[in-house]
Amino acid sequence: ALLLLFVDRLLRGLLQLPSWLGRNLARRRTDSGHRALALGLMAVSAGEPDEARRQAARAQRLLSAPHLTDLLSAQAAHLSGDHNAAARYFTSLTRDSDTAFLGHIGLARLALEKDDPGTALTAARTALDIRPKSALAARQVMILEAERGNWSAALPALSVVMRAGEQ
């Protein structure tokens, strides 16, 4: 009876081995992806574009979290001067309600760097529509509208900035 119990446990263990290995592999893959994401964010913060792009690519391979990896990839591309890639990633972020605000803010910044205030204003307005209390979006709208002399649109944005305690 003891031998039969031992054989039963051994067979059950062998049958469960593939699923255990699969879970372990998936967990390790996710852990490695989160590490790549963290290292990529640190590289962006440190101003290291090559490392940021390398870690962003690694995180995209390992994680099924396009919001996070697209944001990192957009920042890394922007940092390395690849505005076309950054625009693609920021545009991708605009397609999801959870990340649309960040996508539009990123597109506004890219447009400002390309000296395209019209596109920047459109993106900043969209960001402000998504988050009406955002001082960042309101500040961009306020400045761009003021530069156009459109005070009736700049003043409401100024109110948002002032309520947020920004100067």
In which residue ranges do the predicted regions lie?
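TPR-repeat structural position
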Residues: 49-50, 83, 117, 151
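Transmembrane alpha-helices and immediately adjacent membrane-cytoplasm interface residues
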Residues: 2-24
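Short coil turns that delineate tetratricopeptide repeat
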Residues: 64, 97-98, 132, 166
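Alpha-solenoid helical repeat scaffolds
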Residues: 68-72, 88, 101-106, 122, ...
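Alpha-helical segment of the N-proximal tetratricopeptide repeat
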Residues: 29-65, 72, 76
